[in-house]
């Protein structure tokens, strides 16, 4: 199954807020609940919705998500917590959380077009796993800095998680440590994803 490129608001109406997918929000006061069945939710449906939230928020394919669940299952700590840490330490997600891109798909495009450096080296793989003390910068040309400049200026520094720091003048971000569960940008029950 490939990456989702269809209408994003349909997914937000179905699954709830997905800040990594889009900044748009559905119209308030519309009859969204009447369109979908509002009866008793089955356990399978609940687990599937949690899995789909995770997939669409981080922009993963089914195969990528299964690979991350498999890696997290081998860890000695809680599988759900390790899964979220793996997903949050992806380069495209860190760019989004730093405020260098408006959405995760936008951050993926910055990485794919070779505008981003990690520790002074060009990285063009959005799923690159960042480690503590990694320094994330833009290329030293005007075009790369211009792409990131508008997003950094409009981002809210109060929403920056504790495991990241950003220098807005030099367009430089730093990964301080591995993320805690309480700073994940998505409201999700990761245990249901692992059970699915």
UniProtKB/Swiss-Prot annotation:
UniProt GO molecular function: rRNA binding; structural constituent of ribosome
Gene3D superfamilies with a match to the protein in the record: Ribosomal Protein S4 Delta 41, Chain A, domain 1, RNA-binding S4 domain
Domain (S4 RNA-binding): residue spans on this chain: 89-157
Region of interest called Disordered, as start-end residue ranges on this chain: 17-36
SMART domains, sorted: Ribosomal_S4, S4
Gene Ontology annotations for the cellular component aspect, listed alphabetically: chloroplast; small ribosomal subunit
Signal peptide: none
CDD domains linked to this entry: S4
Subcellular location: Plastid, Chloroplast
One GO term of the biological process aspect: translation
Broad class of where this protein is predominantly found: plastid
Keywords: Chloroplast, Plastid, Ribonucleoprotein, Ribosomal protein, RNA-binding, rRNA-binding
InterPro entries cross-referenced by the UniProt entry: Ribosomal_uS4, Ribosomal_uS4_bac-type, Ribosomal_uS4_CS, Ribosomal_uS4_N, S4_RNA-bd, S4_RNA-bd_sf
Family the UniProt entry places it in: Belongs to the universal ribosomal protein uS4 family.
Biological role: One of the primary rRNA binding proteins, it binds directly to 16S rRNA where it nucleates assembly of the body of the 30S subunit.
HAMAP family assigned to the protein according to its UniProt record, in alphabetical order: Ribosomal_uS4_B
Subunit structure: Part of the 30S ribosomal subunit. Contacts protein S5. The interaction surface between S4 and S5 is involved in control of translational fidelity.
Name of the molecule in the record: Small ribosomal subunit protein uS4c
Gene that specifies this protein: rps4
